[in-house]
Amino acid sequence: RYGADVINRIIEQGKPGGVKRLQDAILKETLRPMVGLMCKTAGITADRIFRVAIASNTTMNHLLLGVDANPVRMEPYIPTFFQWRGLVAKDLSFAANPDAEVLISPNIGSYVGGDITAGALTSLIWDKDEFSLFIDLGTNGELVFGNRDFMMSCACSAGPAFEGGDISCGMRATDGAVEAVVIDKDTMEPTLSIVGDAGQKPVGICGSGIIDVIAELYRTSIISAKGQFVREGKRVAHDEHGMGRYILATKDESETGREISITEVDIDSFIRAKAAIFSAINIMLSSLDMDVTVLEHVYVAGGIGSGINMENAVRIGMFPDVDRSLFEYIGNSSLAGAYAMARSDNAVDKVDELASNMTYMELSTNPRYMDEFVAACFLPHTNRELFPSSVQE
């Protein structure tokens, strides 16, 4: 209702009465029913909740607390607050015991918020000697790099494609979502893995499935490095304007009676999203006079599906071409971090410590970022030497 991205929500809260309107949308219209459902499932009443832990992005932290979020999107891109302690449920009319402690995971910068500090907590980057990279895939792609000695963070505007947004048949990773794809190189026929019970027909395609289908289309030479269709077959169709698409499921094969396909426009949107991630990784590492060869762990988080085919993510140039054993998909890390904070004072102290010690890099003011981004808007990249395994294929 108020936009799928934080910028639209900030604009909305800037209108007369907007701050209160969005705060009510979060607390009363969203969280209160969720808490009610959780209490019903657990067989308890809300007054038995004595601690609440929240891990959300910087903008949502501001909107939740009824604080002006405009500084998030305006130069010099400094949030109104970074850390807020001492809250209790009655301060927010939160659906819990009035004296329940409300813990907000702290912000690092305008686009690296409490969801990332909570995620960094669970990744254990801070407890390792080795250099690790933490990547959270969402509308903003957030990165944390470092080890027990230091940590640096940044964010890039990847858009909603990783979560199925701005994709013609995209959806979140719920029942009916195509989450994995393999394409036969000769017949061009797809084999689909679908979220849900056995026999579930496809409804749409989620982030992990989009990664797979683009990687497979490229591997089988159905699309070019620019994401354009260059092979013909019964699974490839074109509209009246000549725009190509690959048909994953015909009307008869889908749950909804609607064709499920991925178009050249979809592919272009996703290429831009993956380019944002890869270029951010390059900029962050190069700012430290390092490159991807120093990486010993790569943790990937986000609601993109039950898992990511890391080989395919590298094939399209989304992640660096390093040993695949370094990658680990850790799922919803911000939720895991909030859970840890709810259960442990030590976790609360640690997440505050991480936030205080983490350096934030603002990519939007980096003069090299756009050049790196444009170079990454190909499959896998304009510099093929960065992807030796793709060259070997």
Residue ranges and their predicted role:
Residues 1-63, 71-73, 103:
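N-terminal glycine/serine-rich phosphate-binding loop of ATP-dependent small-molecule kinases
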Residues 3, 9, 63-118, 162-166:
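Glycine-rich phosphate-binding loop and adjoining helix at the ATP-binding site
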Residues 57-71, 242, 290-293, 302-321, ...:
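Short glycine/threonine-rich loop-to-helix capping motif typified by GTGT followed
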Residues 101-116, 340-393:
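Acidic, glycine/GT-rich loop-and beta-edge segments that sit at the periphery of enzyme/chaperone cores
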Residues 147-152, 156, 290-354:
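Catalytic phosphate/nucleotide-handling subdomain of diverse soluble enzymes
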